[in-house]
């Protein structure tokens, strides 16, 4: 194979590439597989060390890029993941979903830039076997919750099945509309040393990963557009379209215009992004239990002042948590009465409750017999041999070989890797198996192939597997062409399918072409048309959008005030004997008032002025990047990101690109640099990037979001927060009379912080007075930064809410604030009392500030009220209204 000219120029050709890859594979430099699944089949090169034809173009592309190019590729993929907000929360698989550690934060999704390439011939084998397996599991599910002939005929042992947590007694008698009971199926597979494929696990409870698979395709296709165009892998998007049609078709027969929702456990779910991204692709609302209610045997979604009927639920909540009435009583993730609604046939839940029984590891032992009995077919895809402890001969084999098997409990889900257990652990396990043999199975250790990975700019070898997906259609099962590939963890952890990174799976087309038209497979049209995507206005969603508006505005205002304070500090830190320098402690005190955290006391005296200027650098640092500092900039950004994650399906992709840049700018940093110049550079960058990001986000919201009730509630949050911030800032800076030079400096800084200095100078020709400032910042309805403007927008937004009467309590409260404001006059507000205070100004600002807080509280207690027992996703402490 001759290297390309560009590869030769780069000094990195295919021969060198292969030599490095062979060395890495032989020495196992990336993953130590000597105690793990072994090298086995190599996807990339054949037994003679030559690149397989399926991978030729990729080998050329990697060789052409060289080490520097591979490094850049990793960086590009990381940036794309960051920009798209693709996350994953790594949690203990046995974590209680009800009492999980909410301190766990989602981390960035790890994706290997190099795809796993599958030939057209291999895909034909996989597709046929996968579809057959879905058909078989569907037949088993229908039998187990129907006639149970496989039990009565002795093919399946009841003691193994009914003790499995996936069996749901309350699901007996539930029948999905149509011919299929298993709606969606995911299957983990690997390749054996002889090149054939083997199934390692089936996922039927609430299969995850299809959203990640399609997100991975988007990222990798953008990262290597030239290679994507050259290889022209078959697209994954038809699967999303097929899934959408299938969900609509799954509605009860009486539903003429079906409404479909995706039920999620919430943002703390391990695969929250997967759920939200899939909901976005499908065009269906992402909901949580708080959004739904069962009334009169029907499922409804809470909307502002009304209820909307729901016909189909794509369930991503495990079955036992789906209904606290009929299933797990302490669940906060389910909907009371959902099981009863299913029994009545008023709603379809997919995958159906009870489908998790198909994940029983003991079932693998009987699949060959079941395939012959139910399908009259031999399995096309096999699993590693399984031995069930309930059969004497197999129990003997299991006990004799426990140190070399994968041991699984059919009751607890516990999985033990025999080769990793000590003698004492093996002896204890043998006793447990002898005591209750029917609940244990032993499986031969799975084997995996290896494939190229991009590790630190070097082409390395690692064990790989893949998860493939199907969805039920009236005509059969439709697979995703491709799926979710993954790089296995080093050593024995691979046997339990522990992964360290994902891989996009590229299926080569049957006939090479530079482009392939993306179309939905030819399917029978759905029986129902399906409702269009309607605005989601449940209290939970509206609450999160309300707080998005508040946190976004809070971050913008905080960034601007921090910039002004930092700049004034550098101007006056060597001029502390001037009257103008008093603006620094005043601004510092304003920061303290706004954040509810005192920066100092007694600002204004010469001693205090010097003292506050001295501590300004450390205070500005903590107020910018310290996540534990109340009211800090990073805390506002984190609150914004958390609220956005909860309503991901409501937001555009551009939102995540902006948020990613802002989060990086203010991410947690260590102690400030010793050098003041270095610290200032860090702060300047963080504050400026946050301000730019918030302005961009405001533009995205204004120009890209539909101005529905959700947008209205977000704007309400924005207007309340801007009003709170403005009244707190003006009260902290203008209510006390100071030396004229100091007052001018303070007014200038305040106007800059309010983004109104340019218009002020143009109107007043540079003359500074408190009356002129209040005229502009309180009474000018044409100034989008003024208080009256916020009140007018707030009043209009409240009027636009569904069910508005024009005289609701929040509307009356805003009218009262407007009346009070319009009765005041700038000249009167400038008047000074005997104690040197502008008492009327201070009283007005304090009163409106308190009233705005009251409006927020009333909205939270009424339109945004969550059902009884529910808690805000970030807890009460962080949801307090600020400024104080």
From Swiss-Prot:
Disulfide bonds: none annotated. Pfam families: Alpha-E (PF04168), CP_ATPgrasp_1 (PF04174). SUPFAM superfamilies: Glutathione synthetase ATP-binding domain-like. GO terms for cellular component: plasma membrane. It comes from the Bacteria. InterPro entries: ATP-dep_Glu-Cys_Ligase-2 (IPR051680), CP_ATPgrasp (IPR007302), DUF403 (IPR007296). This is Uncharacterized protein Rv2567. It comes from Mycobacterium tuberculosis (strain ATCC 25618 / H37Rv).
